[in-house]
């Protein structure tokens, strides 16, 4: 009986830790996912990067749609300034056909995406990182051969109106890192649609 209780507690702790995902200071796992051009993309492809902006997003979510231009803007600003942006679509396409790979290709072309748009078809990356919403940002900084999480959360403080944004969390974090300072706001609440997890 005691062994069973211990096993149940250990399992609960393990599941809780897994569900929690990454927090600032954690080392982020590398991944290799398929891009809309058919090529595989991983963090280690960016050998000269200072860090990477990983954004979990999708096609159908109204919040993601509102942020598409801002995500593209981040990529244009930072792709060649040391912090390239990678977008990852983790949604179950059975529940939302609009997030299918072919639809991702169309969306990227229509919107002129200047960043890789990857499909996390097993949802393993989203689960490992602890992504729960679309969009959900994980800002990574390269330290040696590893990538360390420096910021987790929202892109900025105004989902509805880009012109009314007061704090650009991702840009602020990158500016602080570039200045050799710690990130003053390292965690915010991601506002968006819940990720559509595959049903068992």
PLM features: residue spans?
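Short, thiol/selenol-centered motifs that function as redox-active sites or metal-ligating centers
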Residues: 58-67, 137, 193-196
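Thiol-/selenol-based redox modules, centered on thioredoxin-like
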Residues: 139-200
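Bacterial Sec-dependent N-terminal signal peptides
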Residues: 1-21
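Short, internal strand/loop/helix patches
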Residues: 105-146
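N-terminal "domain-start" segment that seeds a small globular fold
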Residues: 18-44
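Structural microenvironment flanking redox-active thiols in thiol-disulfide oxidoreductases
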Residues: 65-110, 121-127
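Loop/turn elements at helix/coil->beta-strand transitions in domains of secreted/extracellular proteins
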Residues: 49-52, 80-85, 111-116, 134
């Amino acid at each position: 009986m005691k062994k069973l209780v211990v096993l149940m507690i250990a399992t609960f702790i393990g599941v809780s830790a897994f569900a929690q995902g990454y927090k600032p200071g954690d080392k982020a796992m590398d991944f290799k996912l398929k891009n809309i051009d058919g090529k595989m993309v991983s963090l280690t492809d960016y050998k000269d990067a200072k860090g990477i902006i990983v954004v979990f997003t999708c096609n159908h979510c109204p919040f993601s749609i509102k942020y598409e231009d801002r995500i593209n803007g981040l990529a244009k600003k930072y792709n060649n300034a040391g912090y390239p942006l990678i977008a990852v679509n983790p949604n179950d396409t059975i529940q939302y056909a609009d997030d299918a790979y072919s639809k991702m290709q169309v969306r990227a072309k229509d919107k002129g995406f200047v960043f890789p748009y990857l499909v996390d078809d097993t949802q393993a990356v989203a689960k490992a990182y602890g992504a729960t919403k679309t969009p959900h940002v994980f800002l990574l900084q390269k330290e040696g051969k590893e990538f360390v999480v420096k910021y987790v959360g929202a892109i900025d403080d105004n989902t509805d109106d880009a012109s009314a944004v007061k704090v650009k969390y991702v840009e602020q974090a990158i500016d602080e890192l570039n200045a050799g300072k710690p990130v003053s706001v390292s965690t915010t609440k991601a506002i968006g649609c819940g990720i559509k997890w595959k049903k068992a």
